[in-house]
């Protein structure tokens, strides 16, 4: 049996789809093999050529299952370690999540073959990127969204990175789909013309990486210190551990006062309600102000609402140089985009009694506003995002201000142990710095704590799973990238034009 007849078998295509999907995981950190993104997407498109809509949908689903099954299996670490459920149930939940996310790639492939069944330039160069943009938007929006493993992030060190400050990471997704589709067409049709067009399209954005959209402000360079406490997740919310945790962070911070202008503690570094820690916070605030330093820390806050109930927030507060700390101070940030099951539980009256996984510590948070003013610490303006929020490009951009000196993200990835999850999270954070041309300060409990430059480059970092302090000089920048000015609107206009053209041309072809 020759290869041509073998590849026509649907079962073979489904198996290959799984493999091509799994290959895509190599494009992301910590592997960082960016060509794997093109190979994976090329395989997806080639396998759906000359297939009926349901066959294509199955191929798209299997491809997605290969990608998400291999790329987000780190979720298993937190479920198995802290979920309190039998092993088979843990595996089932991870499989269920991967299968759910694969519905979107299945939808993409099925609709593509339904509306544009012919293997043509129209399908791969116009219809495919527009439809992919829509289905990826749905994946990042429905049920609060999970926009993880978008292939644009693979280009943070790749040839297309220069497109990010211009139109954002989603524009890189768009171009990767177009290029990979043309390569698939060239391979299947054995035609050099799509290959030439693909190479030209891929090369066009390369010079953009040499455009500097920002102006450094060396006169405002400061020393920043980020304390990585490395508190085990199993002990983090243990009441008996609270005093020891505060000692760890304070002892690491005391020598930095008067030396570092800005000191940063990670997400919920203070594992207690803010109102309970007023004596500690006020004493620390006074000491910081006396020595001319400021501190930014994660903490938990609970406020009485109009219904006479408490709203609990995942919060960032500032202490030190400037106005004295006050519990009523507006210089704070409350996390807006909460993670299901980790920070709130849907249908909690039903799910919480079922297993510890649905009743984790601090899983009843309330949302802060979508738009919040920047934090101000020691005269430094910080656009903040807590943990998962840093992967939400449009939300970070909407909170960004022209006078922002730095992007700030604090996180606690201890939930995911030594898996690849924290590295993928770190890669996405780097893209925010590139899109908005600002240095990014990333402070975490156990890694990856780092300073990212305004071009997405790693300027300084410390190892994971170590109780260390990262101290370095950081220079703020000024200036607005095109993406900072417009967000995703230009890409959505382009998507609408491509979609309209694809539908119109398809209708004309069917009438002939």
Swiss-Prot record:
GO BP terms, alphabetized: lipoprotein biosynthetic process
Domain CN hydrolase positions: 227-476
Keywords: Acyltransferase, Cell inner membrane, Cell membrane, Membrane, Transferase, Transmembrane, Transmembrane helix
Protein name, as recorded: Apolipoprotein N-acyltransferase
Any one of the GO CC terms: plasma membrane
Gene Ontology molecular functions: N-acyltransferase activity
Pathway participation: Protein modification; lipoprotein biosynthesis (N-acyl transfer)
Membrane topology: Multi-pass membrane protein
InterPro entries listed in its UniProt record: Apolipo_AcylTrfase, C-N_Hydrolase, C-N_Hydrolase_sf, LNT_N
Compartment list: Cell inner membrane
HAMAP family, per the entry: Lnt
EC number annotated for this UniProt entry: 2.3.1.269
Major location (coarse): membrane
Biological function: Catalyzes the phospholipid dependent N-acylation of the N-terminal cysteine of apolipoprotein, the last step in lipoprotein maturation.
Family recorded in the similarity comment: Belongs to the CN hydrolase family. Apolipoprotein N-acyltransferase subfamily.
């Amino acid at each position: 049996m020759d290869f041509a007849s073998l590849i026509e078998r649907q079962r073979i295509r489904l198996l290959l789809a799984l493999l091509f999907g799994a290959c895509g995981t190599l494009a992301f950190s910590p592997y960082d093999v960016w060509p794997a993104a093109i190979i994976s997407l090329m395989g997806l498109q080639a396998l759906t050529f000359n297939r009926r809509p349901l066959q294509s949908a199955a191929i798209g689903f299997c491809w997605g299952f290969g990608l998400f099954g291999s790329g987000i299996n780190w979720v298993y670490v937190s479920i198995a370690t802290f979920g309190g459920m039998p092993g088979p149930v843990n595996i089932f939940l991870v499989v269920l999540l991967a299968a759910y996310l694969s519905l979107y790639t299945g939808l993409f492939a099925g609709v593509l073959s339904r509306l544009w069944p012919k293997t043509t330039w129209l399908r791969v160069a116009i219809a495919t990127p527009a439809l992919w943009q829509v289905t990826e938007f749905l994946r990042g929006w429905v049920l609060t969204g999970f926009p993880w493993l978008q292939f644009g992030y693979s280009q943070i060190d790749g040839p297309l990175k220069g497109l990010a400050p211009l139109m954002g990471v989603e524009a890189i997704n768009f171009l990767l789909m177009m290029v990979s589709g043309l390569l698939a067409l060239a391979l299947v049709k054995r035609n050099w013309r799509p290959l030439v067009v693909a190479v030209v399209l891929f090369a066009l954005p390369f010079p953009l990486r040499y455009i500097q959209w920002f102006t450094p402000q060396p006169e405002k360079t400061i020393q920043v210190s980020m304390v990585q406490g490395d508190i085990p997740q199993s002990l983090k919310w243990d009441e008996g551990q609270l005093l020891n945790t505060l000692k760890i962070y304070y002892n690491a911070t005391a020598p930095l006062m008067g030396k570092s202008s800005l000191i940063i503690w990670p997400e919920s570094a203070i594992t207690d309600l803010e109102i309970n820690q007023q004596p500690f916070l006020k004493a620390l605030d006074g000491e910081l102000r006396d020595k001319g330093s400021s501190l930014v820390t994660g903490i938990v806050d609970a406020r009485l609402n109009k219904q006479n109930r408490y709203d609990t927030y995942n919060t960032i507060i500032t202490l030190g140089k400037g106005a004295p700390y006050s519990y009523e101070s507006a210089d704070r940030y409350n996390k807006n985009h909460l993670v299901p099951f980790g920070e709130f539980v849907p249908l909690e009256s039903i799910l919480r009694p079922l297993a510890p996984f649905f009743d984790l510590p601090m899983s009843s948070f309330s949302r802060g506003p979508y738009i919040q003013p920047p934090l101000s610490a020691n005269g430094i303006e910080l656009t903040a995002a807590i943990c998962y929020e840093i992967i939400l490009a449009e939300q970070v951009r909407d909170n960004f201000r022209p006078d922002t000196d730095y992007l700030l993200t604090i996180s606690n990835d201890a939930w995911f142990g030594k898996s690849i999850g924290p590295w993928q999270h770190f890669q996405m954070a780097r893209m925010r710095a590139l899109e908005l041309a600002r240095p990014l300060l990333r402070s975490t409990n156990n890694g990856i704590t780092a300073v990212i430059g305004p071009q997405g480059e790693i300027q300084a970092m410390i190892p994971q799973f170590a109780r260390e302090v990262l101290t370095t000089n950081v220079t703020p920048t000024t200036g607005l990238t095109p993406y900072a000015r417009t967000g995703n609107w230009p890409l959505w206009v382009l998507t609408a034009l491509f979609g309209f053209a694809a539908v119109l041309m398809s209708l004309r072809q069917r009438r002939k």
